[in-house]
Amino acid sequence: DRTYNLLQALTSTLEALDAYEVYAQDDSNGIFLELIEDERRHAERLLGELRSCLLAADR
């Protein structure tokens, strides 16, 4: 179901963010900082979709 899929995708995205933050400490090229920005944007979008889905289910 859509709510479950959004929740799982958000969980995976947040786990990736945690890992990238660790990797960024040893990264001199900045690739992980770029990935962190991308994943934060993805997490925000997923959270927004999850909120909308939950609000629609509550009606």
Per-region residue spans from a language model:
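Iron-associated oxidoreductase/ferritin-like identity signal
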Residues: 1-59
